A protein has these predicted regions:
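Catalytic core of pol beta-like nucleotidyltransferases
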Residues: 1-22, 27, 33-41, 50-189
Length: 189
């Protein structure tokens, strides 16, 4: 919807400005992307691909948009990528983004043939939109990573599939795997 597009576009613009030149690309996914009637309190879901973690977090700290030490956020990014942050400029009056922050190298590994887990893979083989790239080469690189990940869906799901499957079963199993290890605030209903 137009309201979602407007909020997402404004958040991207501010995030890129506050990111200090470290953002290479931004992908949008989730309820705002697929239009499943997110309410006004729903965060816009972004994957923020950065050139360097320290530069990105230092820039957000300088802009007053990060409330943790730069060294901690940059360090944790190397231990367990992606970091997840809330980006809420103007105290969230213009919208809130849930940002999965990942370097190009970590994104390539997460979407490759031997990922450490299914966290990013399960999200990014779904419908996503490339909403920002600093260069057309960055955009092409991201699209290539997504295409490769999507081509490998059956290979990474194969050990978890039992019996005959259809598209619905495949999609459900993919979501179960990618979200299964999370503690989520949403209702269990």
């Amino acid at each position: 919807n137009e309201e979602t597009s407007s909020v997402a576009a404004e958040l991207v613009e501010v995030l890129v400005a506050d990111g200090g030149g470290s953002i290479r690309s931004i992908l949008m996914y989730g309820s705002h992307m697929v239009g499943t009637n997110p309410d006004r309190h729903s965060a816009v879901d972004f994957v923020v691909v950065v050139a360097a973690y320290r530069q990105f977090y230092a820039a957000l700290n300088a802009a007053g948009e990060l409330h943790r030490p730069t060294w901690l956020m940059a360090g944790m990014s190397h231990i367990l990528p992606p970091n997840v942050i809330a980006f809420a400029p103007e105290d969230g009056r213009g919208g809130i983004a849930k940002c999965l922050v990942v370097s190009m190298a970590h994104l390539e590994k997460a979407l490759g043939p031997a990922p450490s887990d299914h966290f990013l893979l399960g999200r990014l083989v779904q419908k996503v939109g490339l909403v920002y790239s600093v260069t057309s080469e960055d955009g092409r690189w991201v699209e290539e990573q997504l295409a490769s990940a999507r081509a490998g869906v059956l290979a990474w799901l194969d050990p978890y599939l039992h019996g005959p499957i259809d598209a619905e079963t495949l999609g459900r199993r993919m979501l179960e795997l990618s979200y299964g290890g999370e503690l989520r605030p949403e209702s269990q209903q």
